[in-house]
From Swiss-Prot:
This is Xyloglucan endotransglucosylase/hydrolase protein 4. It comes from the Eukaryota. Induction: By auxin and brassinolide. The gene is XTH4. It is an enzyme of class 2 (transferase). Glycans are attached at N117. Disulfide bonds join C231-C240, C277-C290. Its EC number is 2.4.1.207.
Amino acid sequence: MTVSSSPWALMALFLMVSSTMVMAIPPRKAIDVPFGRNYVPTWAFDHQKQFNGGSELQLILDKYTGTGFQSKGSYLFGHFSMHIKLPAGDTAGVVTAFYLSSTNNEHDEIDFEFLGNRTGQPAILQTNVFTGGKGNREQRIYLWFDPSKAYHTYSILWNMYQIVFFVDNIPIRTFKNAKDLGVRFPFNQPMKLYSSLWNADDWATRGGLEKTNWANAPFVASYKGFHIDGCQASVEAKYCATQGRMWWDQKEFRDLDAEQWRRLKWVRMKWTIYNYCTDRTRFPVMPAECKRDRDA
């Protein structure tokens, strides 16, 4: 796919057209809170900096180590959001991740992974979903903005019916509950939220051909928001005590509406560079869950 030389103009046109239509129902508005309300550092504490009373956090990667943090609680379903500004400049080999994951061998996982690139080349956003330890469900898109220039909002809506990935309230991917088709769906393993910044130059950029240029270090990823609105559960819990009664379980959040599907189609047509659902070399038979992905 060829990236437009004027993504800002395309985005302005898209938003102008959207404003003339009935707007989709987004998830509940995220509530920004300090880092320490919901999260704790997990490794390389000296490579993290907090500002403004913990309302902003920086993760720092150098040639010695990356760093990361995780949520205090574990959750079954909810809405999870973060404002992130990615490292700038030549970031080939550098990965910034924001994801949910359980901890056992047959784990569930819902991933945002931002793959760095050479200066002048667009960063790539990879999403993936693991169920029962099975992943290999990668989708990759170019973003329609420079994610290192300002904060943008990356969100996950997870309920019994679907998982939706949002960028600035625009849906970029859905993963539908296809249990009736024999596909496992994350519904009984509480997950923590994690974020990390690390060197992955063995695979992240052009399959590992582009290596991290440490002359450009340190690499800094910045965070704000730290929003969690989920059903908190113990790691041993198999169901959410409020299952079926929370706002994310209601009818309007069980599927995308027409406007959201239109926006998702725009992402597919203009910005998608890889979708495992359409990779017949890798998957000669379409994976069963892709039958629920109406835009595949």
